[in-house]
Curated annotation (Swiss-Prot):
It catalyses: uridine(55) in tRNA = pseudouridine(55) in tRNA. This is tRNA pseudouridine synthase B. Its EC number is 5.4.99.25. The gene is truB. Responsible for synthesis of pseudouridine from uracil-55 in the psi GC loop of transfer RNAs. Keywords: Isomerase, tRNA processing. GO terms for biological process: mRNA pseudouridine synthesis; tRNA pseudouridine synthesis. Belongs to the pseudouridine synthase TruB family. Type 1 subfamily.
């Protein structure tokens, strides 16, 4: 077994593979069990699948929580049981009136910001210990709780394509969204607001954790690199797993505090009027520190000498206190 590998791979997931299939294949190629992916993709969806190897698997939760960017296609005129092109048609609503691009663009703006979404029946969300797709395959429908997601941007990226004979309208889109977003459901809800049944006819993840589709590599390329002893050329540092978190650069004194798991208190900070920078007033030492009271997130990645040292989080019970969520040194 090869237990010395550590880092992030930007894997291009091809159609037909589940995310677990990719992980299982990589375990064989890399000869290590310590592998995990940073966000599930449906079998028909292609694109960026961040994969953590070795000690970097400790950071999987941050990879999974990161925002994602997708590009795909919506088809209006019929819906499917799976909300994508793979499912059986369940409803047909031919587009018989003039649907304009400006109308589509206007409705897409309704989805920007925090919205509620109901997970599709064909999904891995668990209800009463059972995955929704298991209920769906048994012909059962169950109540699903809504979840709050965030849509940062949602725009049409192609002209509207019309098939008058079939009563269909299609167009490409790009969406930047939070963890837990079902883009299939977004497509269905968009069509519904336009007054029709619809589905997501294509989808590709183009970015995740700072990893871009143009740099993604196929499993076959990883296998060749491994055999040639050149895997390091494809491996990204563990820091990519936390690229979605705010970055705080530590001084030497702060590093000593972080590496032994000490907390940071916002009340310890004052402003050095000569530099207009926040400084620590505890321990009789004055050293620069990012003013964490200004951070809008509940976690931050702590770096020293350009290396990831720890991930800190707001204390759940003590206001103004930041505690280590994971110490990595």
């Amino acid at each position: 077994m090869n237990e010395n590998l550590n880092g992030i791979l930007n894997v291009y997931k091809e159609a037909g593979w589940t995310s677990f299939d990719v992980v299982a294949k990589l375990r064989g190629i890399l000869k290590t069990k310590k592998i995990g992916h940073g966000g599930t993709l449906d079998p028909s969806v292609t694109g960026v699948l961040p994969v953590a190897v070795g000690k970097s698997t400790r950071l999987l939760e941050y990879m999974e929580a990161a925002g994602k960017i997708y590009e795909g296609e919506v088809t209006i005129g019929f819906s499917t049981e799976t909300e994508d092109a793979d499912g059986e048609i369940v409803s047909k609503t031919p587009v018989e009136r003039e649907l304009t691009e400006s109308e589509i663009d206007s409705v897409m703006k309704n989805f920007i910001g925090k919205i509620k979404q109901i997970p599709p029946m064909y999904s891995a969300v668990k209800i009463n210990g059972k995955k929704l797709y298991e209920y769906a395959r048994a012909g059962q429908t169950v109540d699903r709780p809504t979840r709050e997601i965030t849509i940062k941007s949602f725009v049409r990226t192609s002209p509207m394509m019309t098939d008058e004979a079939a009563g269909l309208v299609s167009f490409s889109f790009k969406v930047e969204c939070s963890k837990g977003t079902y883009v299939r459901t977004l497509a269905v809800d968009l069509a519904e607001q336009l007054g029709y049944a619809g589905h997501m006819s294509k989808l590709q993840r183009t970015a995740s954790n700072g990893l871009m589709i143009k740099d993604a590599v196929k499993l076959s390329e990883i296998e060749v690199a491994m055999e040639a002893g050149e895997l390091s050329s494809l491996m990204y540092p563990a820091e990519y797993a936390v690229s979605d978190l705010p970055r705080v650069n530590l001084t030497a004194d702060q590093f000593e505090m972080a590496r032994v798991g000490k907390k940071f208190a916002e009340d310890d900070w004052v402003t050095d009027e000569t530099t207009d920078s926040p400084v620590i007033k505890s321990n009789k030492s004055k050293f620069l520190l990012t003013d964490l009271s200004e951070l809008t997130r509940d976690k931050f990645a702590a770096f020293y000498d350009d290396k990831l040292i720890a991930v800190y989080m707001k204390h759940p019970e003590k206001a103004g206190i930041w505690k280590p969520n994971k110490v990595l040194v």
